[in-house]
Amino acid sequence: MPVLLWGRPGVGKSSFIEGLANEQLPVTTLIASIHDPTDFSGLPVLEDGRVRYAVPRWVDDFTDDGDGILFLDELSTAPPSVQSALLRVVFERKVGFHPLPSGVRIVAAANPPDLMVGGWELSPPLRNRFVHLDWDIPTDLYVHSLTSGWETGELPEVEAKAHAEKLRFFQTRIAGFLRVKPDALHANPEENKYGFASPRSWDFTAALVATSDLLGYRINDEANNQVLFELATGCLGEATAIMLLEYLRNLRLPDPVDVLTGQVIVPLEELDDSELFVLFAGLNDHLKKELDSDRLLPWSDPYLALAGRAFKDGRRDVIFVPLKELASTTWLVRLMAKGQAAGPEKFAIISASINSLFSDEGLREFIEVLS
């Protein structure tokens, strides 16, 4: 996802990014103030009675199947017309109608507003397309580098499948937070210095927290507080980031597998509504992985029992969305088939549990209200 480094002049923003360049990772630097909109949107050319957009030369620096970094330096010197042209480059990753290679990362740098001379404030739409990070050099680090030299930066790698699973894990937790704080979905750009909350920046946050977790920066480790705070603030703004991280650290949730295997009986009265929502979303994720497994039948028993307890506790509305999501898969059909294969007695028990849930009068009333 695109990153914007904010720092005073001379602190090494450009040097660091350009220092990442090697044969497999070309870095192309474009200084915003010396380019016009067509350098980012393409130049319209009439050809055979039709207008096409000629691709700027800098795009050729990147191969179709290779990695690279597009570095947009001095971004705050870009006039509004150039900023508008950059919107598509930064978020849609297209120069005119020409897509950037998938391996190209987009990084920008800018001076803080109080240090800008003759610059332009970034428009809210452009700001919202970046993760914003403050960049500075502590004195002790600079002094150390004078005698020992600068360490070369490295780009960490994260396995895509592992990230997809971890992303889902944090998406359910963020969904739980937004159930408690629905107004946090959006924030006023004018009330935040750089990043501000929007559905897009919440997507960024989930992806970054998932990546951080895989790289060892875990939510409940106090040593990682500053790293996670900087990343969340860069997406959402400081106030929302503080609330989110506090929520994530204080979640009281049992391991979903322990619940599904019957090793843990969930104390419903100790869980608030957001925690119960997150728990059921996590249980769903595990059950959906077992649709073709022999574990589906024994694991569904505790799930149905817990859902029944939540209904009796008057919390149908809390688990309605996760329950509906699971029911929209082949879960019920496969569960009934496995129950039938297990014999008449087991089939009767499973059928009774399912019918009890989905014929519940309170659930029907809740659905009617939603309709």
Predicted region positions:
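AAA+ P-loop NTPase catalytic core and its hallmark functional loops
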Residues: 1-172
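Bulky hydrophobic/aromatic packing residues
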Residues: 6, 40, 53-59, 120, ...
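Arginine residue identity/basic-tract feature
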Residues: 8, 50-52, 57, 88, ...
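Generic serine detector
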Residues: 14-15, 33, 41, 76, ...
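Phenylalanine-focused residue identity feature
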Residues: 16, 40, 62, 71, ...
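Alpha-helical lid/collar subdomain of P-loop NTPases
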Residues: 154-313
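Terminal-proximal interaction/regulatory segments of ATP-powered molecular machines
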Residues: 266-371
